[in-house]
Regions:
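Conserved functional hotspots at enzyme active or ligand-binding sites that engage polyanionic ligands
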Residues: 1-100
C-alpha cells in the first residue's frame, strides 16, 4: 500500500511512500488500523531491512525497525500489490527478533 506517514518525528520516515502491511485482515477490519513497515529505496545495509524481489512492482527495502500502527483511512492508504509470502515472513521474523 502507499500511505502518508506525516506527521513524523526524529528519525521516523515521512511523506507518502509504500509500506508493507504486517497485520492481518481481521485486525485491520476490527480496529480500522493497520500495522505497517515503511519501504525505502535507499540501501543502508541495516540488518532489519528486507529487500523486495526484483519482480515486485514496488522496489526497495522494508524497514522493519520502523513498524507503526496507522489509521489507514485517515492516512489515505491505497493498495498497490500483495507482497510475496517470503517477504512477509522474513519481516515478521525480524520484528520478532526486535521485540523478544
Amino acid at each position: 500500500m502507499t500511505v502518508t506517514f506525516d506527521p513524523q518525528s526524529g528519525h521516523e520516515q515521512k511523506g507518502r511512500r509504500p509500506a508493507l502491511v504486517i497485520s492481518n485482515d481481521q485486525f485491520n477490519q476490527r480496529t480500522g488500523l493497520a500495522i505497517v513497515c515503511p519501504i525505502t529505496n535507499t540501501k543502508r545495509n541495516v540488518p532489519f531491512h528486507v529487500a523486495l524481489p526484483p519482480e515486485s512492482t514496488v522496489t526497495g527495502f522494508v524497514m522493519v525497525e520502523q513498524v507503526k500502527a496507522i489509521d489507514f483511512r485517515a492516512r489515505q492508504a491505497r493498495f498497490i500489490e500483495k507482497a510475496p509470502e517470503a517477504v512477509l515472513n522474513e519481516a515478521l521474523s525480524l520484528l520478532d527478533a526486535c521485540i523478544y
